């Protein structure tokens, strides 16, 4: 599928101070002459900062890595995880439409997005807050149907639950990620049938959901100040 850059482009791009520090740390993983290997994480951080990848962002990353612009464009246009057009200021919603989710009602979730956000995928809502698309398998088949909103998975969705999530996000809330039907992780809907006496170390949330709760806001743009910058391969101390 041919993918093109958006017709409207910003004049420039620059990483925030902390994101630049993070990017330089990633580049330092690779030996001299091999810095181009860092292109995917750097493009991803540029997208996390801005919400999408603009031409200035792609060219900025290419310059940092000593790459021809066309090489950066080849990578950015090849991988569908890179958004080449503006997305909603609050959240970009990705509905999984592959087999398990399709069977369990993904098409009804797409219908909600068309109604509440925009009739077409990748279009931004009238208030500028949301955009959406249907994507291939996101790997949470046991919790189908599901969607990725920002950095997190919202699972076991129904049209009503997705409507509620969009409304809460629109109001400034960040709903707790994970299953939306009350079950823990991907345990059977009817509850455990075996190993009931085994101490699993279960807490209020499973590990990935707990991480989202700890971060607090997993749909906001990444500025680089959210977590410590770690460069253990340099054998240095944790940078605040």
Which stretches of residues belong to each language-model region?
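Signature of N-terminal electron-transfer/Fe-S-associated modules in redox systems
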Residues: 1-240
């Amino acid at each position: 599928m041919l993918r093109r850059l958006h017709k409207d482009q910003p004049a420039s791009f620059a990483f925030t101070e902390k994101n630049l520090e993070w990017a330089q740390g990633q580049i330092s993983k690779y030996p001299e002459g091999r810095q181009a290997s860092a292109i995917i994480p750097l493009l991803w951080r540029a997208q996390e900062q801005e919400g999408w990848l603009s031409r200035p962002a792609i060219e900025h990353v290419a310059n940092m890595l000593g790459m021809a612009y066309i090489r950066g464009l080849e990578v950015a246009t090849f991988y569908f995880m890179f958004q080449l057009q503006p997305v909603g200021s609050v959240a970009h919603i990705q509905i999984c439409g592959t087999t398990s989710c399709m069977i369990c009602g993904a098409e009804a979730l797409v219908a909600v997005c068309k109604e509440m956000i925009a009739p077409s995928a990748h279009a931004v809502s009238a208030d500028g807050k949301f955009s959406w698309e249907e994507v291939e398998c996101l790997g949470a088949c046991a919790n189908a149907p599901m969607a990725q909103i920002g950095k997190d998975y919202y699972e076991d969705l129904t049209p009503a639950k997705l409507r509620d999530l969009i409304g809460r996000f629109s109001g400034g809330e960040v709903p707790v990620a994970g299953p939306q039907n009350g079950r823990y992780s991907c345990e059977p809907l009817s509850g455990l049938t075996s190993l009931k006496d085994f101490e699993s170390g279960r807490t209020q949330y499973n590990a990935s959901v707990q991480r989202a709760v700890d971060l607090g806001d997993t749909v906001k743009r990444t500025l680089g100040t959210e977590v410590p910058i770690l460069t253990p391969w340099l054998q240095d101390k944790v940078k605040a």
